[in-house]
Swiss-Prot record:
Sequence intervals crossing the membrane: 55-75, 97-117, 132-152, 155-175
Peroxisomal matrix-side positions: 76-96, 153-154
InterPro entries: Mpv17_PMP22
Name by which UniProt lists this protein: Peroxisomal membrane protein PMP22
Gene this chain is encoded by: PMP22
Ranges facing Cytoplasmic side: 1-54, 118-131, 176-190
Membrane topology category: Multi-pass membrane protein
Family assignment from sequence similarity: Belongs to the peroxisomal membrane protein PXMP2/4 family.
PANTHER family (UniProt xref): PEROXISOMAL MEMBRANE PROTEIN 2, PXMP2 MPV17 (PTHR11266), PEROXISOMAL MEMBRANE PROTEIN PMP22 (PTHR11266:SF86)
Protein's job: May be involved in the metabolism of reactive oxygen species.
GO CC entries: peroxisomal membrane
Tissue: Ubiquitously expressed, higher levels in flowers and green siliques (at protein level).
Keywords tagged on the record: Membrane, Peroxisome, Transmembrane, Transmembrane helix
Length: 190
């Protein structure tokens, strides 16, 4: 009797999918991590019944935009800088990411969260963004450059979006709790 090939572990299957279908795998990973992050943040913020619509909308945003945007951004940077990982090149990559993709991601998330998830009128969302976006972005700049440095210096290209998605898991909890506290503060002020 012939022996059957050993079964692949979940990690091996995931890595195989990442190799064969990198964009799809990164998009799904970003979406799943964003959804789980939102469930955790809802529980931490005291919501008794999970708001599935909100979770699904955050999965759609992360899977439809954040994962693919990260995939293409990191791929482009690696091609542009020819895969170099010297200190000067890593610094350039971090600066480029922090001055382009990071502000864009945060701005689009805040717009999406207000208009689509909360169904808040655009004029109110715009006012909220004017008040809170600078603080959110400045806070991101206190630790995301370190994440970027680690990512560009030590993490292979095909894992960079995954690492970023894992960090974004916690960042998403922070942003959600911050957005909720700002909404409550605005409601109390009225």
């Amino acid at each position: 009797m012939g022996s059957s090939p050993p079964k692949k572990t979940t990690l091996q299957r995931y890595l195989s999918q990442l190799q064969q279908h990198p964009l799809r795998t990164k998009a799904i990973t970003a979406g799943v991590l964003s959804g789980v992050s939102d469930v955790v943040s809802q529980k931490l913020s005291g919501i008794q019944k999970i708001q599935l619509r909100r979770v699904l909308l955050k999965v759609i945003f992360a899977g439809g935009f954040l994962g693919p945007a990260g995939h293409f951004f990191h791929t482009y940077l690696d091609k542009f800088f020819k895969g170099k990982k010297d200190t000067q090149t890593v610094a350039k990559k971090v600066i480029l990411e922090q001055l382009t993709l990071s502000p864009l991601n945060h701005l689009l998330f805040m717009i999406y969260y207000g208009v689509v998830i909360e169904r808040t009128p655009w004029t109110l969302v715009r006012e909220r963004i004017k008040k809170t976006y600078p603080t959110v972005q400045l806070t991101a700049w206190t630790f995301f450059p370190v994440v970027g440095w680690i990512n560009y210096k030590y993490v292979p290209l095909h894992f960079r979006v995954i690492l970023h998605s894992l960090v974004a898991f916690f960042w998403g909890i922070f942003l959600t709790l911050r957005a909720r506290s700002m909404t409550l503060a605005l409601a109390k002020a009225k």
